[in-house]
Amino acid sequence: MFDQKQCEPNPEKLDYTGKVLVLSPNTLKEEYWSPESQLWLAESGFGCSPTARGRSILCTCLGDGEQTRWNRNDFIGVLKDEYLPDWAKEALKQYQRPEQTEKQEMQMGGM
């Protein structure tokens, strides 16, 4: 399971749009406590912005492709790139828009 140690610092100041978020285990039922259920791609919603009044974030689960709405405070934060598992990298290629994929590859050193 992922925790705060694998996340970027100061999540309250970060824009979540297009980022891989770590869902808090406290939000999940115990039977879903797994990395596959914890990693979500933030796509849109007022909750992506750290300064917006709205808290909703529309997301896709990297483990199974489920799309749903979570609140910003349901997440621990943004996963650091070095902790992104290979299975999640593959899922990102499938769910990200092309411009998001290019931007992420540039940030990760052109993987």
Language-model-detected regions and their locations in the chain:
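A subset of signal/propeptide-processing and intrinsically disordered low-complexity segments
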Residues: 10-13, 76, 100
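Charge-dense, intrinsically disordered terminal/linker segments
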Residues: 59, 94, 102-104
